[in-house]
Amino acid sequence: MGLEVAADSVGSALAAQDGGAIRVELCGGLDGGGLTPSFGTLAVVRERLQIPLYVLIRPRVGDFVFDAAEVEVMRRDVEQCVRLGCDGVVLGALDLQGQVDLPAMRALIEAAGTLGVTFHRAIDVSADPARVLEDAIALGCERVLTSGARASALEGVETIAALVRQAGERISIMPGAGVSAANVQALRAGTGAREFHASARGPVAAQVHAPHPYITDLGGDYQRTDVARVRSIVQLLQTA
């Protein structure tokens, strides 16, 4: 039983570790759903993190239908993760019919070599989550991150539970989206899942001394993973 934390900065990754997370999913642009992190962020986090590090590979916002150039970008990002000694990558690609883009996924998984692979929330916008789960298993993925095809994992609890039953011992189903200390016990009881995914973020006040009177989207407050929030979720998961 454990918590994976989605972190989009060095500070968030280290806070996740300090709070007792079992793993970090490193990304960039978490407010937009998450993108591939910068090379610098990845390198520094890899140097400083002691717990397993998985890296989101997503070249842009929007859907998960990627053209050949985008798949090549993703493949090269995966290769960087291999070179830096990351523990795994987080992937997902769909075709125009909303099914798993098997050629793209196979190319990316081949590039990952011995790294672990999580299939991400592309399953939640797919045409058939149950079929996507079977494809993820066949591809050799370790786990699937899902909200149960709903805006939050709590709303998708019934679908997540069905995926957990379908998966059996073949693959881990990891609920994510809106997971917090307020609902993780209900999610645990309602789904039977054994690992969960959250950002556990809280607000950080801007350090600027004199906010600009006309610009509100630059230099303001931001969100960062909070050690106490991580610890609260972890402690609840450790409660029998």
From Swiss-Prot:
Domain of life assignment: Bacteria
InterPro entries: CutC-like, CutC-like_dom_sf
GO CC terms: cytoplasm
Signal peptide (from-to): none
An MF annotation (GO) of this entry: copper ion binding
Cellular localisation: Cytoplasm
Gene3D superfamilies tied to this protein: Copper homeostasis (CutC) domain
This protein's UniProt keywords: Cytoplasm
Database matches in PANTHER family: COPPER HOMEOSTASIS PROTEIN CUTC, COPPER HOMEOSTASIS PROTEIN CUTC HOMOLOG
Family classification: Belongs to the CutC family.
HAMAP family in alphabetical order: CutC
Identification of the protein by name: PF03932 family protein CutC
Biological source species: Xanthomonas campestris pv. campestris (strain B100)
Organism taxonomic ancestry: Bacteria, Pseudomonadati, Pseudomonadota, Gammaproteobacteria, Lysobacterales
